[in-house]
Amino acid sequence: MAFTDRLLDAWYKGHPALALLRPLEGLYRRVVERKRARFLAGEGDIYRAPVPVIVVGNITVGGTGKTPLILWMIEHCRRRGLRVGVVSRGYGAKPPSLPWRVLPDQSASEAGDEPLLIVQRCGVPLMIDPDRSRAVQALLAAEPLDLILSDDGLQHYRLARDLELVLIDAARGLGNRRCLPAGPLREPVERLSSVDALLYNGAMADRGDGYAFRLKPSALINLRSGERQPVDYFPAGQALHAVAGIGNPRRFFNTLEGLHWRPVPHAFADHAVYSAEALTFTPALPLVMTEKDAVKCRAFAADDWWYLAVDAVPSDAFVGWFDQQLLRLSP
């Protein structure tokens, strides 16, 4: 087991050695609390966009289903006649310059895997830059927009925001509820009391403190041909290689098992860089990966490589609440 996997396991299942990291946790907490206090006091260089900004993020390390929910939000806003743009840090991207407009024919190494996925799926105007304030300004200079979605950036306080949504994995929760490096939290758990809404990925129903949403498999898509098949394309009991380089690979493997297949799991680091050699497994079986991984593998994909497209399905209560917020934010 890799070091990062062991650390995640300790954060979410407990380990006595984490007590040794509490002095560092104390230092980390003071830094992030001071940073937020400066934002609340209006100190520093804070940019407020001329259009509403909605931040979709989390306070935990690891995946929470953020990209599928952002895709849902883009389409939902478009159906209401809103022109939407997205800004992202572009983790792992190496663009020629910053800020950088992501286009569907770019490579994942240039644009970042998640931004490229979003643009290829729905063609939204999207700008990457670690400085999200600069990304928003560049995007507004390039496109007439009514609304900006910030992919992550909850802790990027230089960008003023009108709405904060925080996603939590319902199965893993907040782990030991401690901050880095003694736990998985980017900010103290008390931060959740100040956000506008919590969304629990995988929850069976809305909770007293937040809304439920789930990820619904929608299709199997061939990496080479683009052929689209229903999720029952493989028969029950089909053995296949399952590749996931996401924040929580186990969730993807569980999804495949829920479709009654027998996945041979191959977990990679989040934002992993792939090669044909790295994805050559024995025995020879069909290979199914996440859509986020697929954007990095099309150039060398084999004929029997597929990705599982998933769609976010939020609860009716969240949809109603979100529509109210859009009305409130509309000019």
Curated annotation (Swiss-Prot):
Pfam families: LpxK
Purpose: Transfers the gamma-phosphate of ATP to the 4'-position of a tetraacyldisaccharide 1-phosphate intermediate (termed DS-1-P) to form tetraacyldisaccharide 1,4'-bis-phosphate (lipid IVA).
E.C. number(s) listed in UniProt: 2.7.1.130
Family: Belongs to the LpxK family.
Single Gene Ontology MF annotation: tetraacyldisaccharide 4'-kinase activity
Keywords: ATP-binding, Kinase, Lipid A biosynthesis, Lipid biosynthesis, Lipid metabolism, Nucleotide-binding, Transferase
Domain of life: Bacteria
Binding site for ATP: T60, V61, G62, G63, T64, G65, K66, T67
GO biological-process terms attached to the record: lipid A biosynthetic process; lipopolysaccharide core region biosynthetic process
Catalytic activity annotation: a lipid A disaccharide + ATP = a lipid IVA + ADP + H(+)
GO cellular component, one term: plasma membrane
Biological or metabolic pathway of the protein: Glycolipid biosynthesis; lipid IV(A) biosynthesis; lipid IV(A) from (3R)-3-hydroxytetradecanoyl-[acyl-carrier-protein] and UDP-N-acetyl-alpha-D-glucosamine: step 6/6
InterPro entries: LpxK (IPR003758), P-loop_NTPase (IPR027417)
Keyword field contains Cell inner membrane: no
Protein name as it appears in the record: Tetraacyldisaccharide 4'-kinase
Stored PANTHER family: TETRAACYLDISACCHARIDE 4'-KINASE, TETRAACYLDISACCHARIDE 4'-KINASE, MITOCHONDRIAL-RELATED
